[in-house]
């Protein structure tokens, strides 16, 4: 896989760095039976109020139904294509199983068309793209698409280039210790499933959109500085010219302390599952 640096033909292209999709993807047409309509919300809730800032516009998309559960056990599937998915940073692969069923999965790094994958329990080989419970995966193995609770479907380590490392059982033998990308060490139920390998498109982090219009195509609206707003819109707003914050610490748009303040609630039930906080 490679990235392309666009030549300086115009100011919109001057800083652009993009992933060379043509060298990776095998088709531009998705599987129609696995597509559903994706209505645009523009960051609004059912009352029309903004609940997520900087969302809106963007190119029309359809959602690809992804198999995060990987619960089709002991039936081999063949990788038929590696495709672009506008709804995530990683690539996706179309899998056709021996019984004819088709499913999309998150494409692991290094997977190729024609490769065989399988899901199951202790009898499954530790090979790229295979999915099995954490208790049967050897220490040191890199995995992705990890379940937070059994049969819930993968929720952790799904973005481009992400992976987590198996560290082994804890002292109770009921949980598996896993080191996440952030450096956090966390306990997972040993029955939770994970997929072998690293998520594809690891060079996504090197991309540079180059111009504001590219962000608008992705549905990302501008982020305005608080100091450029009016005082009724932001705690940093108002004043004559470029005024300082005027407080002992920066604030969020809702008046809470910002930068360097821990916001995690220690009373969350999942706190007991965190062995070491992220760096």
From Swiss-Prot:
Keywords: Ribonucleoprotein, Ribosomal protein, RNA-binding, rRNA-binding. The keyword Protein biosynthesis does not apply. InterPro entries: NA-bd_OB-fold, Rib_uL2_dom2, Ribosomal_uL2, Ribosomal_uL2_bac/org-type, Ribosomal_uL2_C, Ribosomal_uL2_CS, Ribosomal_uL2_dom3, Ribosomal_uL2_RNA-bd_dom. Residues 223-279 are annotated as: Disordered. The keyword Ribonucleoprotein applies. GO terms for molecular function: rRNA binding; structural constituent of ribosome; transferase activity. Belongs to the universal ribosomal protein uL2 family. One of the primary rRNA binding proteins. Required for association of the 30S and 50S subunits to form the 70S ribosome, for tRNA binding and peptide bond formation. It has been suggested to have peptidyltransferase activity; this is somewhat controversial. Makes several contacts with the 16S rRNA in the 70S ribosome. This is Large ribosomal subunit protein uL2.
């Amino acid at each position: 896989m490679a990235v392309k640096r666009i030549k300086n033909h115009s100011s919109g292209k001057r800083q652009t760095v993009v992933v060379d999709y043509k060298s990776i993807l095998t088709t531009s047409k998705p599987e129609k039976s696995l597509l559903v309509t994706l209505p645009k919300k523009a960051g609004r809730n059912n009352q029309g109020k903004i609940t997520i800032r900087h969302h809106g516009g963007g190119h029309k998309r359809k959602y690809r139904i992804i198999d995060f559960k990987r619960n089709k056990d002991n039936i081999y599937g063949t990788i038929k294509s590696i495709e672009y998915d506008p709804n995530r940073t990683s690539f996706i692969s179309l899998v056709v199983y021996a019984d004819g069923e088709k499913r999309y999965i998150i494409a692991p790094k290094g997977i190729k068309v024609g490769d065989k994958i399988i899901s199951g329990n202790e009898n499954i080989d530790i090979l790229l793209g295979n999915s099995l419970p954490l208790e049967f995966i050897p220490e040191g193995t890199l995995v992705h698409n990890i379940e937070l609770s059994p049969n819930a479907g993968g929720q952790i380590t799904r973005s481009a280039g992400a992976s987590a490392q198996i560290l082994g059982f804890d002292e109770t033998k009921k949980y598996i210790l896993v080191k996440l990308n952030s450096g956090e060490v966390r306990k997972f139920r040993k029955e939770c499933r994970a997929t072998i390998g690293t998520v594809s498109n690891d060079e996504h982090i090197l991309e540079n959109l180059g111009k504001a219009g590219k962000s608008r195509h992705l549905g990302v609206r501008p982020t305005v500085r608080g100091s450029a707003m009016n005082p009724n819109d932001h705690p940093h707003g108002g004043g004559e010219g470029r005024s300082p914050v005027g407080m002992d610490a920066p604030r969020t748009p809702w008046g809470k302390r910002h930068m360097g303040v821990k916001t995690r609630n220690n009373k969350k039930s999942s706190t007991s599952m965190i062995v070491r906080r992220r760096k």
